[in-house]
Amino acid sequence: MKAIIVLLMVVTSNADRICTGITSSNSPHVVKTATQGEVNVTGVIPLTTTPTKSHFANLKGTKTRGKLCPNCLNCTDLDVALGRPKCMGTIPSAKASILHEVKPVTSGCFPIMHDRTKIRQLPNLLRGYENIRLSTRNVINAERAPGGPYIIGTSGSCPNVTNGNGFFATMAWAVPKDNKTATNPLTVEVPYICTKGEDQITVWGFHSDNEAQMVKLYGDSKPQKFTSSANGVTTHYVSQIGGFPNQTEDGGLPQSGRIVVDYMVQKPGKTGTIVYQRGVLLPQKVWCASGRSKVIKGSLPLIGEADCLHEKYGGLNKSKPYYTGEHAKAIGNCPIWVKTPLKLANGTKYRPPAKLLKERGFFGAIAGFLEGGWEGMIAGWHGYTSHGAHGVAVAADLKSTQEAINKITKNLNSLSELEVKNLQRLSGAMDELHNEILELDEKVDDLRADTISSQIELAVLLSNEGIINSEDEHLLALERKLKKMLGPSAVDIGNGCFETKHKCNQTCLDRIAAGTFNAGEFSLPTFDSLNITAASLNDDGLDNHTILLYYSTAASSLAVTLMIAIFIVYMVSRDNVSCSICL
């Protein structure tokens, strides 16, 4: 007799598990963030460099001016600016200029009292212009000026090109011809004779000597008064009578007298005035200047080319957007000074390699995966891991990694824009002073640099914060992508992991990473948790009563087990029984 029995049995599977993952690294780097402090990451982009001192150089992409007149031999820049005989030449145009003379003086000619006026600033003023030329005609007729007629004085200390007595081309030494008597203050107007909207730099001054020489030359031994006025700027002087040492500061021939030299800047169309008494040095040829040339303290000669000229380090080639070290003024394509080294995160948070599944069990491996990373994600930061009989397979998701890199690139570009804006602010502050000595007060400059440094550091901290925090965003996107690809062939078990109803080796994982995965290709079996199997029994001596006895015994045992389980759950819910499960 044959009997048919329906048996209930549970079928288990050898499913694989697939998780989203992050690469591991054996060489952690540290970056600073706004809220998390220092964080170890898998890679960094250094943003700062510490330069070393080098020669000053020509600025790349622009003309750089060293000496005002390169072809004027044995002449200082002040000689050129005053028009000293034998120092007359063309000043080349330039977008950048080197302030190379620490204490500008003339190399000879008539001795000047440098410390009484701002005459030492005259070469610096001229350097601040891109185009500079000396007028071909005199601005006034000195011989017929008020208080004349005058004889134009010369000096043996100031030889001309024929080695005869001479004087500066920018001034006429007005010595009374016949009327050597004291005079009340006289006024002469200085017209604007430049063209093309140029600034006119007019040089003038006065001569003073001991009492005997003053009477001999001018008929008056008393101190003389002088005033200049242009563009609302008025300057007053009173001459000194006698008391000058024979040795001159300029190293020229001994002289009993001295001259005081000053200048005034006349804007287009504006007239200047000079009020004077005896001993005046009336203006003659004037400087016509236009455009702007950035000026920096440095030294000559200029060797080679550089991206940036820095007062302390010389010529620099820009390799990083920022630099640490000694702060000073700089011109050109320069890095910005910051107080501390800066690094931008170029990867993910540092994670040591996660432990394998077989070492910790499945749930232990999940914990290890979340704490650590996976080696083998070549050229990728985010990807997938598969755990199963084949071991551990790892594949990088290059699209997700590229998105992360694009975000870092965007942060770099934002920092670059911030750098440009700050450079423009610094450059603007310098340009505003182009008519002066072009030196900012050190304390104000340092305060500005310190403020900009703090802004940049904060921007880098916030960028690092955003890059690191975006890991969650990338992993969540990967998890959604993985879930969509796996579809009904896997069960979401949390923590970015899925239990598959099929095997998933390296080939399977590579397909997932490439976005070409198809579950049908990996022999998906029927996976019902309960299977009903029909079993046929031959008549081997078991009667129906025996079979029913076995069945009732099994059913009763199952019922008792269910009742016990329900009772335990009830007691636990009432807090009468505690239950601890250790993994």
UniProtKB/Swiss-Prot annotation:
One of its GO terms (biological process) is virion attachment to host cell. It comes from the Viruses. Residues 573-583 are cytoplasmic. GO terms for molecular function: host cell surface receptor binding. Palmitoylated. Residues 1-15 form the signal peptide. The record marks 360-361 as: Cleavage. The keyword Disulfide bond applies. Residues 16-551 are extracellular. Glycans are attached at residues 40, 74, 160, 179, 246, 317, 346, 505, 531, 544. Its main location: virion. The chain crosses the membrane at residues 552-572. Keywords: Disulfide bond, Fusion of virus membrane with host endosomal membrane, Fusion of virus membrane with host membrane, Glycoprotein, Hemagglutinin, Host cell membrane, Host membrane, Host-virus interaction, Lipoprotein, Membrane, Palmitate, Signal, Transmembrane, Transmembrane helix, Viral attachment to host cell, Viral envelope protein, Viral penetration into host cytoplasm, Virion, Virus endocytosis by host, Virus entry into host cell. It is a single-pass type I membrane protein. Disulfide bonds join 19-497, 75-87, 109-158, 504-508. The keyword Membrane applies. One of its GO terms (cellular component) is membrane. Major glycoprotein, comprises over 80% of the envelope proteins present in virus particle. The extent of infection into host organism is determined by HA. Influenza viruses bud from the apical surface of polarized epithelial cells (e.g. bronchial epithelial cells) into lumen of lungs and are therefore usually pneumotropic. The reason is that HA is cleaved by tryptase clara which is restricted to lungs. However, HAs of H5 and H7 pantropic avian viruses subtypes can be cleaved by furin and subtilisin-type enzymes, allowing the virus to grow in other organs than lungs. HAMAP family: INFV_HEMA (MF_04072). Binds to sialic acid-containing receptors on the cell surface, bringing about the attachment of the virus particle to the cell. Plays a major role in the determination of host range restriction and virulence. Class I viral fusion protein. Responsible for penetration of the virus into the cell cytoplasm by mediating the fusion of the membrane of the endocytosed virus particle with the endosomal membrane. Low pH in endosomes induce an irreversible conformational change in HA2, releasing the fusion hydrophobic peptide. Several trimers are required to form a competent fusion pore. Belongs to the influenza viruses hemagglutinin family. Homotrimer of disulfide-linked HA1-HA2. This is Hemagglutinin. It comes from Influenza B virus (strain B/Oregon/5/1980). The gene is HA.
